[in-house]
Amino acid sequence: MTLDKAKKGNRVTILKLPSGQYKAQFIRLGISEGDSVLCSERLPGGTIVIQKNRQEIAIGSDLAKKIKIILQ
């Protein structure tokens, strides 16, 4: 399953991040493979807002389609 399929309120575990530049950027933001995050919002246009601890990160729909997850 990919992150773009997560519904608001779902807690998910990140299985695989896109490689290269995107992966490095997520790691800088404190998000890595194996982390548990909350899908806190789904915005118009497909943007997904995830929350880890008290930090929220908005992820565009194209990038969300490249992030593999599993529901908890």
Locate predicted features.
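Compact, glycine-rich, soluble single-domain proteins
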Residues: M1-Q72
